[in-house]
């Protein structure tokens, strides 16, 4: 299986995940819009630098361990290029805006009151079941009562 070539180094993605821990998997449109707006802003690098201290603590610890980077240090030079940030935006939208397929079950409830002559309630229910199974009683759209949906992941 061929893996997709990323537009930036692992270090760049690690930096972005300080601010956006779900950067690579984000699918909420409002969050994606915020990421795109920030990356497209000419003042992006300054904003990222100033806000790193509020970022994900685990990711900040990883940055220190992996790259020796601490809050206040310079961000990767690669992020300073508007062109490079546009590449990130394109990659982000291409991979995260894909529609996903879901299976949804629809359950309709049809109901009809049926009168039948019988010796007792059990026999009445048995006779109605037999008539229903043999298609002597057919429920249709006029018998619709309710519906429900359930999602399967």
Curated annotation (Swiss-Prot):
Keywords: Restriction system. GO terms for biological process: DNA restriction-modification system. It comes from the Bacteria. Encoded next to the DpnI restriction endonuclease. This is Protein DpnD.
């Amino acid at each position: 299986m061929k893996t997709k070539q990323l537009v930036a180094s692992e270090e760049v993605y690690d930096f972005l995940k300080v601010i956006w821990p779900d950067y690579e998997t984000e699918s909420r449109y409002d969050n994606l819009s915020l990421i795109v707006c920030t990356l497209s802003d000419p003042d992006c690098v300054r904003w990222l630098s100033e806000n790193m201290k509020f970022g994900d603590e685990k990711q900040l610890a990883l940055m220190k361990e992996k790259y020796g980077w601490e809050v206040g240090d310079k961000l990767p030079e690669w992020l300073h290029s508007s062109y490079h940030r546009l590449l990130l935006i394109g990659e982000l939208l291409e991979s995260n805006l894909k529609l996903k397929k879901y299976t949804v079950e629809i359950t309709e409830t049809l109901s009809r009151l049926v009168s039948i002559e019988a010796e007792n309630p059990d026999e009445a229910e048995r006779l109605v079941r037999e008539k229903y199974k043999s298609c002597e009683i057919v429920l249709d759209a006029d018998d619709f009562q309710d519906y429900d949906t359930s999602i399967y992941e």
